[in-house]
Every structure is written in structure tokens, then in C-alpha cells.
Amino acid sequence: MTDRYAVFGNPISHSKSPFIHGQFAAPTQESLTYEAILAPVDGFEASLTAFFNAGGKGANVTVPFKEQAFALCDSISPEAKLAGAVNTLSLLADGTIRGDNTDGLGLVADLIANLGSLQDQRVLLIGAGGAARGCILPLLNAEIAQLTISNRTHTKAQLLVDIFTSVDNGAYASKVTAVEMSELAGEFDIIINSTSASLAGELPPLPAHIITTQTVCYDMMYGASVTAFNQWALSQGAAKAIDGLGMLVGQAAKSFTLWRGVEPDTQVVLTLLRDKLMAEPK
């Protein structure tokens, strides 16, 4: 029997998820289909219910439904709880829905694939939206030395710090801080841009001196050409600049493993996806 999976979003026609999961399924001999479903902005719950009633086993969720999906879950993972959003839904044997957030796990997996280890790294996270919030716990669990969060609106960055310093009886309190962009100083091993500024060819207002020849920069956005943030980082002398395509594949792999109990080969699929992206009409 072929199991059915999908990704829900609005818009959704641009989604790479059907291609990614199709590539995961073939070599692992998993019998499944995976489709993109456009849900009405005011009709996500009805669309999801219809999907599960028709035999759907699990689903990914993207903009703008991640918070709505969170509210529909009967149980959630620690990552999803702290992110306040889910991107992966699983219909369990008892008919309940479990929610996970694999975005941050995908980010960490891609960083480790590129850098080897995140242990004792000093990390600067730019942005304080949902993308940033979803990756904080996985970064901390990767045993980084320090996480600095900086955002155009400082109060939003401080709010994230307050949330995560209260986790596990303050276990992370000494590791997470919020700093105004204009007051950023010192050196960072890794700088992660979680904002969508690159999609518009724009940059967060960052001081150039935070980039050194040892700094690795990571933009969660991606495209056929180098993103605006990564162009800027390289022009300032960064050691390396990585885009978010590997994060996309990584989070999909974590979802696939949750559903199927099989770990797919992400690097092969990442290469195929990169080639596909480069071949698309500009």
C-alpha cells in the first residue's frame, strides 16, 4: 500500500518538498506519494482534516499555517513547543496528531555537514521571527558556547532571550543574550541570517566589523545565485558563506525519518536540488 503525504501552504506552487521527498523515497524503497496542497488562508484546518480523512499519514506545513498547525496538535515535541509552531504533522495509530518542528534540526544538520561540529562556537543569530525561534533550541543542544540574538526591533530579540533562559530551570541562561544591532561587538564564529531580507535584495543593518576572516556566514534564504547577505559577507572577508538550501533538505530529511523511520541521504538530494535550481528559468 502506498502511503500519502503532503505539504500545505499558501502560496505553495514554488515548493521543493515534493521533489525532495520523491528523491528520498526512491533509494530507500519507501512506498509513498507526496504532493503540494494549496489551502485557503481561512481553510487550513478543513483542508488538513480532509487530507487525513482521505488516508493521509503525515504532512509538512509552511507559511502561513505553522502556528495554526501548532494549535491543532494533540502532542508536540520540545522543539515545536519552544518554537510555538510546527512544520511536521504525523497522524498516530490512535488517531491523534503529533506536531514537530524540524526547521532548526535541519539548520544544525547542515551546519555540521559543512563545519564538522558546532561545539564551543560563538553564534550570532540575526532576526527574531519564527525562523529564528525555531532554531534556538537545536543550536543550544549542539553545545555552542554562546548565542547572541540581534534584531531590528530589540524588544523582540529580548523576548526570545526571556523565553529560552527560562527553559530547563535556566540551564541556558548564561548562553543566550540579546544585543542591539548598532552595539554588536567582538567576534563571532558563525553568523546566521534568519530574516527574509535577501529575498528583496536587502541587508540587515549590521556593522561590517563583526565579520572576520574566520567567520562563517549562513543565510536561511537561497536562490540560483548567491544571496544578498552572503554576497555582503564574502565582500567583508568572511571565510565561508552558506545558503539555506541544505537546511531545506535537512528539515525535510528529519520529517521523512519521523514518518518512515529511515534516514535518507541528504547530500545526494542536495546536489540534485541545487542542479535543478540552477537549471530553472531565471
UniProtKB/Swiss-Prot annotation:
It is an enzyme of class 1 (oxidoreductase). Keywords: Amino-acid biosynthesis, Aromatic amino acid biosynthesis, NADP, Oxidoreductase. Pfam families: SDH_C (PF18317), Shikimate_DH (PF01488), Shikimate_dh_N (PF08501). One of its GO terms (molecular function) is shikimate 3-dehydrogenase (NADP+) activity. One of its GO terms (biological process) is amino acid biosynthetic process. The keyword rRNA-binding does not apply. NADP(+) binds at G127, A128, G129, G130, A131, N151, R152, T153, H154, T155, K156, M220, G244. Shikimate binds at S15, K16, S17, T62, N87, D103, Y222. Its EC number is 1.1.1.25. Pathway: Metabolic intermediate biosynthesis; chorismate biosynthesis; chorismate from D-erythrose 4-phosphate and phosphoenolpyruvate: step 4/7. The keyword Ligase does not apply. The active site is at K66. Homodimer. Involved in the biosynthesis of the chorismate, which leads to the biosynthesis of aromatic amino acids. Catalyzes the reversible NADPH linked reduction of 3-dehydroshikimate (DHSA) to yield shikimate (SA). This is Shikimate dehydrogenase (NADP(+)). The gene is aroE.
